[in-house]
From Swiss-Prot:
PANTHER family, sorted: ASPARTATE--AMMONIA LIGASE (PTHR30073:SF5)
Lineage: Bacteria, Bacillati, Bacillota, Bacilli, Bacillales
HAMAP family: AsnA
Name of the protein described by the UniProt record: Aspartate--ammonia ligase
Main location class: cytoplasm
Reactions listed under catalytic activity: L-aspartate + NH4(+) + ATP = L-asparagine + AMP + diphosphate + H(+)
Annotated Pfam families: AsnA
Keyword Metal-binding among UniProt keywords: no
Domain of life: Bacteria
CDD domains given in the database record: AsnA
Location of this chain's protein in the cell: Cytoplasm
Amino acid sequence: MYQSLMTVRETQIAIKEVKTFFEDQLAKRLGLFRVSAPLFVTKKSGLNDHLNGVERPIEFDMLHSGEELEIVHSLAKWKRFALHEYGYEAGEGLYTNMNAIRRDEELDATHSIYVDQWDWEKIVQKEWRTVEYLQETVRTIYGIFKDLEDHLFEKYPFLGKYLPEDIAFITSQELEDKYPELTPKEREHAIAKEYGAVFIIGIGDVLRSGEKHDGRAADYDDWKLNGDILFWHPVLQSSFELSSMGIRVDSQSLDEQLTKAGEDFKRDYDFHKGILEDVLPLTIGGGIGQSRMCMYFLRKAHIGEVQSSVWPDEMREACKKENIHLF
């Protein structure tokens, strides 16, 4: 039966250790400045992240003006707009401590309706919009993960060390070719188990099979220049996503992806006009799950062991039987 390596109190202390170390190193190594993040945005701005395109945001109207607002899903688009508004230049970037509510999330051991992540974004030059630059950035972030594991091992040696020396790279098409008989999720399990840490490149577009590896909104990542960081989770014995990130759409890729997604109506939104008219800067960015990070590095079996959220009664009961104590 599962046994947590830490008490609840010890876990809370270790969570702060994880978040403080990672935040400090993320800012230093990517050259990012911390900024305040919004909890909600106006509906008409088009700044909310619509994720896979089907999740419903929480909407409400403001008494003062009657304007319709949405609780953010993430700050994928807001960050790019903020870089423009704040006058950042190529090579400079920002990050935020983002909190969101995703009402349509399917709850399980790794998914909660409460989302907390380091949302970051950095301005790039046109010639940097390459797979090579994407991989270079992934390696930088992976280096922080490696150093975090070493840092925690010094304080809590019983946590062990599991990450390989380097992160592997594979495209979603290569992954499908390698495991044609498996579902996309099963492919992720297989490749993460093989390498321990892997970045899957190119998520959102249709593969040669006619299926997508996974859905991605058409209006922030360039589907050829994005991907997910996956680890093999030693407790869950499954693949475990730590981050989705990518080089963002330029005017050409946004034009193509909106048409593919059947979302040409978004061309009238302020944010989308800013990209199509080359007003907003070219960027790279992503989200790094804070609770996911704590869950992996503290060797937890359920995300509810590292964050406070709401869970169905039947899930709480099932967790109790497995000796999993949710916050």
